Amino acid sequence: RQSFTEYDRNVYNAVASLYVYGDPSHIVTPAMVYRAMTGLTDAEKPTAGQLAAVARSLDKMRFIRARIDCTEELKMRHITLNSQQINNGEIDTSLLMAEAVKVKAGGQTVKAYHILKVPILYEYAAAVKQVLTVSASTLDIKELNPDGSAGARLPNTESRILIKGYLIRRIEGMKGKNKLNNPVVALYDYQRDGETHYGLYSITGKVDPTREEMRRIREDAEKMLAYWKATGYITDYEVQTQGKKITGFKITAYA
């Protein structure tokens, strides 16, 4: 059984954006998906390794089965069957309805994907009004110069893509109409109400990280938060500690 990872989630969200806002042919290449995921311009080329990672994710999601309880959506839309209100419903489909195709562009033949249907998770999120939309400039993180101005781009490693995607999802949840109560993004896993909540270390796949890996993840997260504060995406953030141990970041997402 193949798992749906944090990286897959970022790829999936990029595909959904391209389906809804992109070319009406609904044909996407790994390069298009990677650019949408990271905020790169059309003139910037992802590496072969980055493209291969996206292609693996897309191929995997084509064969992952998705079951979604759509009861509330059906009730909200007052959908009936034989004049009777439907009280319970479940969608059973593929996570990504797509077929692999080969297309020729610029004299080169490349692997692409024809997205056959609105990605199911996006469709459901739209139905319950939980679609998250962020600008390309929010995705395109810049390191800040000593004077606070934007400097060079923070390179997109797989770890940084995971950190960025998770932070954005949490921040958008804080900004949403329900305003999530917990403004703290934890670095370590923790238990609440009998459930395990994963911290940034686990989100990046580092269940037992080394000291160097922890330092790098913390620094990357803080660079992103500092950039978003400078550009107005968030209002502020604070480093959370227990003694000398850094445990997370408290984010103020709105004034």
Map each language-model feature to its residues.
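Charged, alpha-helix-forming regions
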Residues: 1-255
